[in-house]
């Protein structure tokens, strides 16, 4: 019985510490990036290196590929079967990334969320495009 209680307490202690290992920081990128409906490309330089970029659809549906992940040079996301956002970065320990945004022909605004991270630290960047 004592072993069970000790195991349970150890597990609770471990789980409670996980959140302390990951913290939100500012890598020097803007919190929100807005593109006109015509699209375009832009380079963003940060003030610290990062190891990966995760791309999320903030409002995924059953038909969406709501998550794309990459340690590689390019990572992209499909949104409603229309590839509109491409992220390019130099891989592990880079300090910049480039966004390619296709023209918006849907007539509606659209958005994605990027998480720039370095294992224990992350920054969230919202990418929006006018409709």
Segment roles from a protein language model:
Residues 120-131:
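C-terminal edge beta-strand
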Residues 31, 40-44, 97:
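Structural beta-strand segments of beta-rich domains
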Residues 95-105:
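Short, hydrophobic beta-strand segments
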Residues 106-120:
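A short beta-strand micro-motif common to beta-rich folds, especially ectodomain repeats
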Residues 38, 47-49, 102-104:
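Hydrophobic loop/turn residues within beta-sheet-rich immunoglobulin-like superfamily modules
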């Amino acid at each position: 019985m004592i072993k069970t209680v000790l195991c349970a307490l150890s597990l609770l202690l471990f789980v409670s510490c996980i959140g302390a290992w990951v913290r939100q920081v500012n890598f020097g990128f803007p919190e929100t990036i807005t593109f006109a409906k015509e699209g375009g490309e832009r380079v963003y330089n940060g003030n610290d290196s990062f190891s990966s970029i995760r791309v999320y659809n903030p409002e995924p549906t059953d038909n969406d590929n709501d998550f794309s992940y990459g340690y590689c040079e390019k990572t992209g996301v499909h949104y409603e079967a229309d590839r509109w956002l491409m992220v390019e970065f130099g891989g592990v320990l880079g300090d910049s990334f480039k966004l390619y945004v296709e023209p918006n022909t849907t007539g509606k605004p659209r958005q994605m969320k990027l998480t720039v991270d370095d294992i224990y630290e992350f920054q969230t960047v919202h990418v929006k495009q006018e409709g």
